[in-house]
Amino acid sequence: MRMNNIYISGTGLWIPPYGITNDELMESYNAYVKKFNTDNSEEIASGTIKELSPSSSEFVEKASGIKHRYVIEKDHALDPNYMKPLIPARDINELSLLAEIGVKAGKDAMKNAGVTADDIDAVIVSTANLQRAYPAVAIEIQNELGIEGYGYDMMVACSSTTFGISNAMADITAGKAETILVINPEITTAHNNMKSRESHFIFGDVCTASVVQLNSSSKNKFKILDTKLKTVFSNNIRNEFGFINHIENKTYQEDELLFKQNGRSVFKEVCPMVVQLIEEQLNTLNLSTDDISQYWMHQANINLNKWILNKLLDGDVDEKRAPNVLDEFGNTGSAGSLIAFHKFNHLEKGQKGLICSFGGGYSICSIIIEKE
């Protein structure tokens, strides 16, 4: 069958030009907190408004493992009077932001796969959040790269990258295409509340891409042995922003239309599901955890990954076997596991690895690959 000869034949990565350290972020956030508490001192004293608490780099690193993140714009994101990135609006005849960074990551993946636009049959943009409803960003990228065929957008929150690769594999298996470019533009700072102590430190911006191909001739190809997907509905990770807001009989505050999560519930509910899914997948393939040389896990929180890997592997796992990019990139939505794979892939011929994403939805996808 076709599905036995489908490969990830190349990956790509685009990184924004600006970085923010935890110390820089804390200086900004704590200045905002001080200003907020001063400006609202009477309301705080009367109990009508809750006083905000400052934060620290040490707290952030312990709680998440994050030390740094890349961002699309830095100055306004760190301005205590603004607290979000600010970018110029673009004319509809200009390439959109997501398409622009998607083209850059896509070209990197194409170069690493040894393919050209003429070789590609389809473009899938799969991301945690899209900047518009239509026309599809994938079709815009398709046009910019000069690719014939088709394109579409999809969103599965934190698992969008792996679900996108799985969709590409399904399209190839069905005979719709032979080579598909999957792109994951993640401008996560745009839907982050940087005024919130619980979330202001979490996100970073990035774009990843992968070439999924039938019968690849790439010198650095990885056969996809299996994909396993699972979704379970939950409101514990939620973003309310959407076109229905426009017609609802409600006036939303800005923070109501941004990322929200109940972190403790996510930890308690998602982590066991990830362990169960991976164990079931390995059992189906008659594999054990010892057969997996590397694990490229979702990069949301180092403590989640430690818990999952300790359960799977009966103890601590070294960073070479399960690379961590959280310290440099922060949570990049759905892109983290592919960043880890792109930067820290050390498989030798015949060795197997596992790429896994999980989070909002809830959604989980695990992809098992083998180096050829």
Where would I find each of the regions flagged by the language model?
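Condensing-enzyme catalytic core mediating Claisen C-C bond formation in acyl metabolism
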Residues: 1-95, 196-268, 276, 358, ...
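Short beta-strand segments
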Residues: 9, 126, 155, 180-186, ...
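Conserved beta-ketoacyl condensing-enzyme motif
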Residues: 8, 52, 56-58, 66-156, ...
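Flexible, glycine-rich active-site loops centered on histidine and acidic residues
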Residues: 176-207
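Acyl-CoA/ACP chain-elongation machinery
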Residues: 184-185, 192, 232-240, 301-302
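Claisen-condensing/thiolase-fold acyl-transfer catalytic domains that form or cleave C-C bonds
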Residues: 99, 103, 129-130, 143-144, ...
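Buried hydrophobic positions in well-ordered alpha/beta secondary-structure cores of metabolic enzymes
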Residues: 8-10, 60, 109, 123, ...
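Short acidic, glycine/serine/threonine-rich loops at helix termini
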Residues: 19-20, 134-137, 165-166, 191-197, ...
